[in-house]
């Protein structure tokens, strides 16, 4: 289920352009389904890759600070 959610994110983002390698690597390292579901929702709502990257980085930085 984790892999399917991750692939769903990548498929949604394909229409917006290329995912920056750094962000792709971070998303591939995620193992919590809740994190991937949150990013899936961000990807579904994103109107541009730039906006998705900004929101995803903000979320991931917040997660890193909590750990």
Predicted regions and their residues:
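Elongated, amphipathic alpha-helical interaction scaffolds
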Residues: 1-67
């Amino acid at each position: 289920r984790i892999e399917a959610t991750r692939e769903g994110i990548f498929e949604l983002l394909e229409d917006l352009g290329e995912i920056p390698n750094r962000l792709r690597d971070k998303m591939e390292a995620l193992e919590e389904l809740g994190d991937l579901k949150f990013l899936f929702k961000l990807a579904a709502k994103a109107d541009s890759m730039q906006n998705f990257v900004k929101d995803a980085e903000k979320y991931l930085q917040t997660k890193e600070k909590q750990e």
